[in-house]
Amino acid sequence: MTLNLKTPFPTFGGSTGGWLRAAEVEEKYAITWTSAKEQIFEMPTGGSAIMRNGENLLYLARKEQCLALSTQLRTFKINDYKIYRIFPSGEVQYLHPKDGVFPEKVNPGRTSVNSRGFSIGKNPNPASIKFSGITTYES
Protein backbone atom coordinates (compact mmCIF):
# COMPACT_ATOMS: atom_id res chain seq x y z
CA MET A 1 0.00 0.00 0.00
CA THR A 2 1.40 3.37 -0.95
CA LEU A 3 0.42 6.77 0.32
CA ASN A 4 -0.06 9.52 -2.25
CA LEU A 5 1.25 12.68 -0.57
CA LYS A 6 -0.24 14.86 -3.35
CA THR A 7 -3.78 14.13 -2.14
CA PRO A 8 -5.53 17.38 -1.11
CA PHE A 9 -6.29 18.15 2.52
CA PRO A 10 -9.78 18.92 3.84
CA THR A 11 -10.52 22.63 4.28
CA PHE A 12 -9.83 23.47 7.92
CA GLY A 13 -9.69 26.99 9.30
CA GLY A 14 -8.32 26.18 12.75
CA SER A 15 -5.17 24.63 14.13
CA THR A 16 -4.34 21.25 15.61
CA GLY A 17 -3.36 22.92 18.87
CA GLY A 18 0.31 22.06 18.46
CA TRP A 19 -0.33 18.33 18.18
CA LEU A 20 1.80 17.91 15.07
CA ARG A 21 4.92 19.67 16.40
CA ALA A 22 5.99 16.59 18.37
CA ALA A 23 4.95 14.41 15.43
CA GLU A 24 7.70 15.93 13.29
CA VAL A 25 10.31 14.55 15.70
CA GLU A 26 8.65 11.22 16.54
CA GLU A 27 5.99 9.99 14.13
CA LYS A 28 2.69 11.12 12.72
CA TYR A 29 -0.33 9.38 11.32
CA ALA A 30 -2.22 9.93 8.08
CA ILE A 31 -5.73 8.91 7.21
CA THR A 32 -7.00 8.85 3.64
CA TRP A 33 -10.55 8.45 2.39
CA THR A 34 -12.71 9.13 -0.64
CA SER A 35 -15.88 11.20 -0.38
CA ALA A 36 -18.68 11.35 -2.93
CA LYS A 37 -19.43 15.00 -2.05
CA GLU A 38 -18.14 17.94 -0.04
CA GLN A 39 -19.49 17.79 3.50
CA ILE A 40 -18.65 19.09 6.94
CA PHE A 41 -17.15 16.77 9.54
CA GLU A 42 -15.85 17.21 13.07
CA MET A 43 -12.10 17.13 13.56
CA PRO A 44 -10.83 14.83 16.34
CA THR A 45 -8.63 17.71 17.56
CA GLY A 46 -11.61 20.07 17.84
CA GLY A 47 -13.45 22.26 15.38
CA SER A 48 -14.85 21.25 12.03
CA ALA A 49 -13.56 20.94 8.50
CA ILE A 50 -14.96 20.44 5.02
CA MET A 51 -13.92 17.24 3.28
CA ARG A 52 -13.27 17.55 -0.42
CA ASN A 53 -15.11 15.75 -3.16
CA GLY A 54 -12.89 12.79 -4.05
CA GLU A 55 -9.73 11.82 -2.21
CA ASN A 56 -8.79 13.37 1.14
CA LEU A 57 -5.62 13.17 3.24
CA LEU A 58 -5.31 14.33 6.85
CA TYR A 59 -2.29 14.22 9.16
CA LEU A 60 -2.89 13.61 12.86
CA ALA A 61 -0.54 13.11 15.79
CA ARG A 62 -2.14 10.01 17.34
CA LYS A 63 -3.52 6.78 15.94
CA GLU A 64 -6.50 7.14 18.30
CA GLN A 65 -7.42 10.39 16.55
CA CYS A 66 -7.43 8.59 13.20
CA LEU A 67 -9.61 5.83 14.62
CA ALA A 68 -12.02 8.41 16.08
CA LEU A 69 -12.27 10.10 12.69
CA SER A 70 -12.78 6.74 10.97
CA THR A 71 -15.72 6.03 13.28
CA GLN A 72 -17.24 9.33 12.24
CA LEU A 73 -16.57 8.67 8.55
CA ARG A 74 -18.52 5.44 8.80
CA THR A 75 -21.59 7.46 9.83
CA PHE A 76 -21.22 9.22 6.44
CA LYS A 77 -21.16 5.76 4.76
CA ILE A 78 -17.45 6.17 3.94
CA ASN A 79 -15.76 2.80 4.42
CA ASP A 80 -12.68 3.07 2.23
CA TYR A 81 -10.43 4.87 4.71
CA LYS A 82 -6.85 3.79 5.34
CA ILE A 83 -4.56 4.72 8.23
CA TYR A 84 -0.78 5.04 7.83
CA ARG A 85 2.11 5.73 10.23
CA ILE A 86 4.75 8.12 8.87
CA PHE A 87 8.18 8.13 10.50
CA PRO A 88 10.45 11.22 10.46
CA SER A 89 12.72 9.42 7.99
CA GLY A 90 9.84 9.40 5.50
CA GLU A 91 9.12 5.68 5.81
CA VAL A 92 5.40 4.90 5.52
CA GLN A 93 3.79 1.94 7.29
CA TYR A 94 0.24 0.81 6.47
CA LEU A 95 -1.72 0.23 9.69
CA HIS A 96 -5.46 -0.14 9.32
CA PRO A 97 -7.35 -2.22 8.21
CA LYS A 98 -4.34 -4.53 8.31
CA ASP A 99 -5.63 -7.41 6.19
CA GLY A 100 -8.09 -5.32 4.19
CA VAL A 101 -11.09 -6.23 6.35
CA PHE A 102 -12.24 -4.22 9.34
CA PRO A 103 -11.75 -5.99 12.70
CA GLU A 104 -15.46 -6.35 13.44
CA LYS A 105 -16.18 -7.97 10.07
CA VAL A 106 -15.79 -11.66 9.27
CA ASN A 107 -12.87 -12.63 7.09
CA PRO A 108 -12.68 -16.28 5.95
CA GLY A 109 -8.92 -16.41 6.56
CA ARG A 110 -9.03 -14.75 9.98
CA THR A 111 -8.80 -17.02 13.01
CA SER A 112 -10.96 -16.17 15.98
CA VAL A 113 -9.26 -15.27 19.24
CA ASN A 114 -10.83 -15.87 22.67
CA SER A 115 -14.14 -16.93 21.16
CA ARG A 116 -16.53 -19.40 22.66
CA GLY A 117 -18.47 -21.90 20.58
CA PHE A 118 -21.74 -21.10 22.32
CA SER A 119 -23.88 -18.14 23.34
CA ILE A 120 -23.58 -16.39 26.68
CA GLY A 121 -26.76 -18.07 27.89
CA LYS A 122 -25.01 -21.45 27.71
CA ASN A 123 -22.23 -20.42 30.12
CA PRO A 124 -21.88 -22.84 33.05
CA ASN A 125 -23.04 -21.73 36.47
CA PRO A 126 -19.95 -20.38 38.32
CA ALA A 127 -21.19 -21.92 41.59
CA SER A 128 -21.09 -25.41 40.07
CA ILE A 129 -17.38 -25.11 39.16
CA LYS A 130 -16.22 -22.98 42.09
CA PHE A 131 -14.20 -25.62 43.97
CA SER A 132 -13.52 -27.96 41.06
CA GLY A 133 -10.09 -26.48 40.26
CA ILE A 134 -11.28 -25.25 36.85
CA THR A 135 -11.45 -21.52 36.28
CA THR A 136 -14.66 -20.04 34.90
CA TYR A 137 -13.04 -18.85 31.68
CA GLU A 138 -11.68 -22.34 30.91
CA SER A 139 -14.91 -24.26 31.51
From Swiss-Prot:
Gene3D superfamilies: Photosystem I PsaD, reaction center subunit II. Its main location: plastid. It comes from the Eukaryota. One of its GO terms (cellular component) is photosystem I reaction center. It holds the Pfam family PsaD. Keywords: Chloroplast, Membrane, Photosynthesis, Photosystem I, Plastid, Thylakoid. The keyword Membrane applies. InterPro entries: PsaD, PsaD_sf. GO terms for biological process: photosynthesis. This is Photosystem I reaction center subunit II. It comes from Skeletonema costatum (Marine centric diatom). The lineage of its organism: Eukaryota, Sar, Stramenopiles, Ochrophyta, Bacillariophyta. The gene is psaD.
